[in-house]
């Protein structure tokens, strides 16, 4: 094309943050020619009618002198995020994620932006409203208030998960500033400048264990890992250390080595809940070099940290899975703590990436050293280590300050024979808790179900109350007096006095137990004990998790009851008793990872007690005392568990011997959704690679969710990219109706739900 007909002197090929899989051309205005480069984050109009204040964010891939689309070309509107430029490794990672995880390029781009809502980097601070210092008592406080405006404010803050400014809160609750002032005076709420939300050093000491002297195994691990770090060669190391073996101290020494070499670090933890303790530990050692990234930060906070990391003002980033996409400069070390944890897999929204695997790929692209740390490695990672694909460093014993923990199994079948009913607590557990209370030691109780009663059923017709929108039994939450669906969050707050099916009155029975009931029973057994419950109900508002953990860590509570969030990586030196109330519950799920997840969970809970000089004890209640998974967890023998479990995986051809792709089809009409699923299934079967295998169609474990019916089938393959191409061709040929949606999940963590 004749360059004289080009309306711009320079053009940019970009990927737009939208659900499209195309690279688009935009013109570069003269005033931006010296600012736009490869990797620039820019603002572009996606439709011709968009005005200057309506735009999409895009990443620049290439600068060129001409375009074949001059008749429709539009200009780049401006640079974004203060002219931050993504490094080439992140651009390459966008393409890899799009290809591997079966998602449009535009969807992959969204992972690499701090927030699609923050228009530019800003150092301006804003006030946010939070619950007061006694946030965990808000439900009790509500019962004492008679002012409807104040009640409305507190209830709104209980339900919200994002920071609200005073004007936003007043608008949403229709109250005046006087109402907020009154709540502030009563210390029921706090109004805080966003700049003051960063953790101050003096607030961190209650989380920190005493730094031990490294033992020989730890020193060997540090030396092994440091070799690739010094050589600037890509290497993945599996750090397999029993609970309490001092993996964090190994991380610390390797990070020091990386910083001495001028390299930056990304440290991933599986959940936001763990970020506070990890941040506390490393901020004490590295101070302002450390930054944190996670979804509970405000848009401006997240953007500021992202900006500082890209400018080299922060050299250590800590956060959950999304932190792996931070554009930190001169990356040399990536650590994935608790690498086995399913929270590293994004399962709620596409792209359905696995952050552990993305970390390994980013390490490969940057010649960085990658550490995968765990006391219970995933079977995939352990297999890679045994086959020498990864290096293996083993910490086989607890650190010098820790005492070996004694683990005991309690056969609940025998307890039933004694009491002639199904008890929640064995007599052994009751006595053991009493002993800890007498000497001032702490207890952790693990029970992986929320709520008070897990089901409500009719004694006459046997009907069980279910969510009207999901194939899910409703759970009774006593504190809020509601029946709640744990899938779609539907709440039934009106009292149900008769059976919806047979209309019988006085026939409804509340059965089962969740953490809320366990807490109530413990208060009945031990009325003077100070108990804390840690689950998604008590930690749903900002700051509540940290406040509860601090309360327990500083000895202001005796017993901590919680779901799986208490099993992960927390350090409480005064805890000498850990109790697993239902050690076998996860084994009843028909999923190929069920045994692995039960083993991991029990082992992680086991590691919460006896982490200091005090001896620890673990009690595991089970109705399956002969089950081999529980026996291996009891013995804390991962190699024995692996040896047994890997045989079953090989016979059934499941990971790590193959890769899985899960195709899920959703629609409002069950029959029609099934027919569409069958059409695509047939097309894939006709063209599938001979080395891959196609499983039959089945309903998903959660068949109906939010009024949509779910069907699925699995593909087993050793070449994900080839299989993805065949799926894409089948979907294109099928031309699915708009009434049915297809989700492709590569390397799923579950094949059932």
From Swiss-Prot:
- Motif DEAH box per UniProt: ranges: 337-340
Q: Where is the Helicase ATP-binding domain?
A: 228-395
Database matches in SMART domains: DEXDc, HELICc
Kindly list the GO CC terms recorded for this protein.
Answer: primosome complex
Which reaction is this enzyme known to catalyze?
Couples ATP hydrolysis with the unwinding of duplex DNA by translocating in the 3'-5' direction; ATP + H2O = ADP + phosphate + H(+)
Q: Name any cofactors this protein relies on.
A: Zn(2+)
UniProt: ATP binding residues: 241-248
An example GO biological process term is: double-strand break repair
**InterPro entries this protein is in?**
DEAD/DEAH_box_helicase_dom (IPR011545), Helicase_ATP-bd (IPR014001), Helicase_C-like (IPR001650), P-loop_NTPase (IPR027417), PriA (IPR005259), PriA_3primeBD (IPR041222), PriA_3primeBD_sf (IPR042115), PriA_C (IPR041236)
As recorded in UniProt, its EC number(s) are 5.6.2.4
The GO terms this record gives for MF are:
3'-5' DNA helicase activity; ATP binding; ATP hydrolysis activity; DNA binding; zinc ion binding
| Keywords in alphabetical order | ATP-binding, DNA replication, DNA-binding, Helicase, Hydrolase, Isomerase, Metal-binding, Nucleotide-binding, Primosome, Zinc
Residues the entry annotates as binding Zn(2+) 1: 458, 461, 499, 502
Q: Where is the Helicase C-terminal domain?
A: 491-646
Q: Does the keyword Cell membrane apply?
A: no
Q: Which residues bind Zn(2+) 2?
A: 467, 470, 485, 488
Q: How is the cofactor bound?
A: Binds 2 zinc ions per subunit.
Gene3D superfamilies the record matches: P-loop containing nucleotide triphosphate hydrolases, PriA, 3(prime) DNA-binding domain
Q: Which domain of life is it from?
A: Bacteria
Q: Does the keyword Cell membrane apply?
A: no
What is the recorded function of this protein according to its Swiss-Prot or TrEMBL entry? Initiates the restart of stalled replication forks, which reloads the replicative helicase on sites other than the origin of replication. Recognizes and binds to abandoned replication forks and remodels them to uncover a helicase loading site. Promotes assembly of the primosome at these replication forks.
Belongs to which family? Belongs to the helicase family. PriA subfamily.
Q: How does it assemble?
A: Component of the replication restart primosome.
**Which HAMAP family does the entry mention?**
PriA
- Kindly provide the name given to this protein in its UniProt entry: Replication restart protein PriA
Gene name, Swiss-Prot/TrEMBL: priA
């Amino acid at each position: 094309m004749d360059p004289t007909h080009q309306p711009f002197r320079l053009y940019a090929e970009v990927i737009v943050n939208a659900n499209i899989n195309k690279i688009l051309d935009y013109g570069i205005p003269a005033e931006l020619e010296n600012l736009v480069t490869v990797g620039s984050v820019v603002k572009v109009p996606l439709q011709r009618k968009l005005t200057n204040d309506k735009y999409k964010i895009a990443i620049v891939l290439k600068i060129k002198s001409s375009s074949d689309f001059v008749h429709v070309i539009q200009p780049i509107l401006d640079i974004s995020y203060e002219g931050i430029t993504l490094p080439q490794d992140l651009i390459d990672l966008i393409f890899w994620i799009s290809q591997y995880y079966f998602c449009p390029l535009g969807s992959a781009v969204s992972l690499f932006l701090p927030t699609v809502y923050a228009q530019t980097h800003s150092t301006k601070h804003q006030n946010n409203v939070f619950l007061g210092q006694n946030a965990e008592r808000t439900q009790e406080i509500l019962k004492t208030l008679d002012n409807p405006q104040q009640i409305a404010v507190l209830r709104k803050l209980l339900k919200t998960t994002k920071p609200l400014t005073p004007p936003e809160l007043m608008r949403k609750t229709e109250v005046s500033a006087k109402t907020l002032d009154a709540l502030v005076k009563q210390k029921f709420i706090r109004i805080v400048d966003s700049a003051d939300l960063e953790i101050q050093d003096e607030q961190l000491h209650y989380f920190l264990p005493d730094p031990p002297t490294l033992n020989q195994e730890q020193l060997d691990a540090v030396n092994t890992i440091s070799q690739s770090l010094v050589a600037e060669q890509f290497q993945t190391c599996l750090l397999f250390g029993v609970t309490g073996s001092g993996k964090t101290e190994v991380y610390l020494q390797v990070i020091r080595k990386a910083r001495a070499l001028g390299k930056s670090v990304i440290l991933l933890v599986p959940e936001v809940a763990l970020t506070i303790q990890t941040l506390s530990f490393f901020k004490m050692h590295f101070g302002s070099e450390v930054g944190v990234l996670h979804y509970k930060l405000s848009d401006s906070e997240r953007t500021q940290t992202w900006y500082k990391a890209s400018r080299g003002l922060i050299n250590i980033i800590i956060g959950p899975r999304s932190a792996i996409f931070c554009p930190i400069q001169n990356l040399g070390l990536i650590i994935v703590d608790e690498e086995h944890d399913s929270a590293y897999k994004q399962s709620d929204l596409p792209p359905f990436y696995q952050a552990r695997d993305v970390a390994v790929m980013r390490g490969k692209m940057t010649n960085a050293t990658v550490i995968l740390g765990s006391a219970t490695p995933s079977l995939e990672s352990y297999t890679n280590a045994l086959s020498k694909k990864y290096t293996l460093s083993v910490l086989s014993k607890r650190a010098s300050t820790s005492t070996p923990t004694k683990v005991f199994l309690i056969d609940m079948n025998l307890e039933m024979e004694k009491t002639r009913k199904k008890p929640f607590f064995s007599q052994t557990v009751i006595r053991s808790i009493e002993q800890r209370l007498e000497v001032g030691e702490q207890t952790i109780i693990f029970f992986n179900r929320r709520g008070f009663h897990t089901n409500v059923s009719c004694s006459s017709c046997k009907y069980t109350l279910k969510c009207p929108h999901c194939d899910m039994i409703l759970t009774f939450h006593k504190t809020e007096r509601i029946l709640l669906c744990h899938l779609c969050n539907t709440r039934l707050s009106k009292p149900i006095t008769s059976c919806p099916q047979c209309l019988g009155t006085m026939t409804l029975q509340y059965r089962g137990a969740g953490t809320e009931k366990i807490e109530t029973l413990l208060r009945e057994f031990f009325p003077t004990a100070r108990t804390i419950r840690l689950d998604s109900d008590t930690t749903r508002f900002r700051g509540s998790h940290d406040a509860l953990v601090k309360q327990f860590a500083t000895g202001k509570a005796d017993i901590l009851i919680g779901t799986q969030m208490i099993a992960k990586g927390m350090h409480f030196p005064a805890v000498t008793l850990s109790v697993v109330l239902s050690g076998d519950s996860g084994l009843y799920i028909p999923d190929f990872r069920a045994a692995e997840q039960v083993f991991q969970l029990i082992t992680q809970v086991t590691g919460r007690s006896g982490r200091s000089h005090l001896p620890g004890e673990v009690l595991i209640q089970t109705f399956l005392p002969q089950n081999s998974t529980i026996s291996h967890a009891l013995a804390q023998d991962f190699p024995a568990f692996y040896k047994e479990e890997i045989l079953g995986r090989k016979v059934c051809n499941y990971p790590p011997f193959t890769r899985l792709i899960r195709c899920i089809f959703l629609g409002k009409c069950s029959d029609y959704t099934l027919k569409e699923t069958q059409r695509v299934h047939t097309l894939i079967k006709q063209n599938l690679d001979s080395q891959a295998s196609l499983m039959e169609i089945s309903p998903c474990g959660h068949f109906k969710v939010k009024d949509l019916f779910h069907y699925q089938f699995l593909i087993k393959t050793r070449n994900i990219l080839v299989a993805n191409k065949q799926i894409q061709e089948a979907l294109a040929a099928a031309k699915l109706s708009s009434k049915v949606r297809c989700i492709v999940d590569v390397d799923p963590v579950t094949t059932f739900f």
